[in-house]
């Protein structure tokens, strides 16, 4: 009987070896792919083990408006938000924003006609109501919904402190020659308490304090504020800057050349 050709013998030896190598490589590649997949915090149901990480991510989402309109502060994040406000990070975040705002303000050429405007919101922008919110669950939560009656009672007291960073920014803008206009969602019948509170903590020299009148009741904050900004522009004012803690302070028509949102993860006002 004749011996098999040498090529056949080589095939019988090489093919099984090649199959073995392919199988090993496939397993190694699969293992490599599996180990390179990154699991996001909470994606495997372990969010409770990474609550702080989740809450910091949630806070970033709401501050950047990626969350859009949101309802309430997640109950799992109340402690995290409390630590944020009571620790150093909140103040640090605020001062960084103020530094950027003032850097921009210094690039503006002031005309000297009194029409170069910077707009400020009041609550959680110039004045902090953290004393009230600290006593009421740090904002709106399902366990303790917002109570407008008790908040208005707080406003009437006129004891809200100033943000040190905002006061610094406010006074620096005045020195640069900006006309300051205050645009708030507070009602007209709160004017005297609001003016007294602002002056008591160091604010002065604003051109106008605009509050909600009877015709503004029921309007969303966004619509109310864009209407007021439009009126200012119609009167010849140039809105260079705008600072507020809510996106509704800043968005819509007649926006500023630059808007600066200061942090507030306690509540959302549409």
Question: What are the roles of these predicted feature ranges?
Answer:
Residues 113-116, 174-181, 204-208, 236-240, ...:
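Loop/turn elements at helix/coil->beta-strand transitions in domains of secreted/extracellular proteins
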Residues 226-229, 233-270:
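Acidic, Mg2+-coordinating phosphoryl-transfer loop and its flanking beta/alpha structural elements
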Residues 125-127, 133-134, 175-180, 185-190, ...:
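Solvent-exposed loop/turn segments at secondary-structure junctions
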Residues 124-125, 157, 166-199, 208-212:
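Substrate-recognition element of Asp-dependent hydrolases with the DxDx(T/V) motif
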Residues 188-240:
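Substrate-recognition "cap/lid" segment bordering the active-site pocket of phosphatases
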Residues 69, 74-77, 91, 111-117, ...:
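Active-site neighborhood of HAD-like aspartate-dependent phosphohydrolases
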Residues 2-120:
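Non-catalytic pre-domain segments flanking phosphatase-related domains
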Residues 93-96, 100, 153, 161, ...:
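Extracytoplasmic/secreted proteins, especially bacterial periplasmic and envelope-associated proteins
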């Amino acid at each position: 009987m004749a011996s098999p050709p040498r090529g056949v013998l080589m095939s019988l030896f090489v093919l099984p070896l090649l199959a073995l190598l392919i199988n090993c490589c496939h397993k190694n590649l699969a293992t490599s792919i599996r180990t390179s997949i990154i699991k996001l915090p909470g994606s495997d149901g372990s969010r409770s083990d990474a609550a702080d990480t989740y809450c910091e991510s949630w806070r970033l989402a709401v501050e950047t408006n990626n969350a859009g309109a949101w309802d309430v502060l997640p109950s799992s994040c109340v402690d995290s938000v409390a630590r944020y406000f009571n620790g150093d990070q909140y103040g640090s975040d605020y001062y960084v924003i103020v530094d950027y705002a003032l850097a921009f303000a210094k690039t503006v050429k002031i005309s000297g006609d009194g029409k170069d405007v910077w707009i400020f919101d009041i609550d959680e922008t110039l004045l902090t109501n953290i004393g009230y919110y600290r006593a009421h669950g740090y904002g709106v939560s399902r366990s303790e919904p917002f109570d407008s009656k008790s908040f208005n009672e707080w406003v009437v007291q006129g004891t809200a402190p100033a943000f040190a960073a905002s006061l610094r920014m406010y006074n620096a803008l005045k020195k640069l020659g900006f006309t300051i206009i205050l645009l708030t969602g507070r009602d007209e019948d709160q004017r005297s308490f609001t003016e007294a509170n602002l002056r008591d903590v160091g604010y002065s020299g604003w051109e106008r304090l605009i509050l909600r009148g009877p015709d503004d009741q029921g309007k969303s904050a966004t619509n109310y504020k864009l209407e007021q900004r439009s009126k200012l522009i119609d009167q010849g004012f140039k809105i260079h800057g705008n600072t507020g803690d809510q996106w509704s302070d800043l968005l819509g028509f007649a926006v500023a050349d630059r808007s600066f949102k200061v942090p507030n993860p306690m509540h959302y006002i549409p």
